[in-house]
Amino acid sequence: MASKRWCFTLNYKTALERETFISLFSRDELNYFVCGDEIAPTTGQKHLQGYVSMKKLIRLGGLKKKFGSIAHWEIAKGDDFQNRDYCTKETLIAEIGAPVKKGSNRRKIMEIYEEDPEEMKLRDPDTALRCKAKKLREEYCSEVSVFSLRPWQIELHRALMEVPDDRTIIWAYGPDGGEGKSTFAKELIKYGWFYTAGGKTQDILYMYAQDPERNIAFDVPRCSSEMMNYQAMEMMKNRVFASTKYRPVDLCIRKKVHLIVFANVAPDPTKLSEDRIVIINC
């Protein structure tokens, strides 16, 4: 039978034997570990009484393979605190991590996900999906990109060094494709920018409302050029808008942000005021 929570008893003769056994427990593989020394009152035998909460399910055979066959193992009863009290009633020898009461929310959701992603997918698929997305985003943002900036990218970078206002929309226009628009847009994600390929107004506003102080990058695919969402752009740039999807909220934000549109088409002058647009030709 497999379990994450086990208790053990290890009879030993020397301190070296005891310490060698304890050293086998890795912080990366467990949530909590504690052990204490005891001496049997009738025989005088020294033994280590311990408890471990592993991150993954493990069977008795797996424990013996990992920690050797000299210890006696049983599936633990009670919570972390109860097992800690039992194991340390005479002497505390070693402790890794912190005990958690049964049903406690002290441990972070991400830690629970990383212990057993498949279990969380079954129990709470929505939370598991968000955890997976967060992990993938962290990995993406940690990757170092090396490339030479093109002239238009240098011009755009200089524009972004200016203090943003509540009107200007920067339009990176490249009709041919392959100019590096999407490459630049995706790189901005690593600097905390909100990235969107467009879509329905309320879908965009709902996602942006999660953190509405971010700079904004619209990376519009060629196939969506005829459905450019000028409404969402202007609402987000104005810093006052309502997100009505799922959790309705009215947002009034003081912080001004940059908004860039990366597109294969020029802006439609009938949809946005001409003085709003700063075009950078790619």
Swiss-Prot record:
Motif (Nuclear localization signal): 56-77, 99-105
Pfam families assigned to the protein according to its UniProt record, in alphabetical order: RNA_helicase, Viral_Rep
Gene Ontology CC terms: host cell nucleus
PROSITE patterns given in the database record: CRESS_DNA_REP
GO BP: any one term: DNA replication
Catalyzed chemical reaction(s): ATP + H2O = ADP + phosphate + H(+)
Other comments on record: The genome of nanoviruses is composed of six to eight segments. In addition, some isolates contain subviral DNAs.
Domain comment quoted from the record: There are 3 rolling circle replication (RCR) motifs. RCR-2 is probably involved in metal coordination. RCR-3 is required for phosphodiester bond cleavage for initiation of RCR.
Family listed: Belongs to the nanoviridea/circoviridae replication-associated protein family.
Protein name, as recorded: Para-Rep C2
Gene source species: Milk vetch dwarf C2 alphasatellite (MVDC2A)
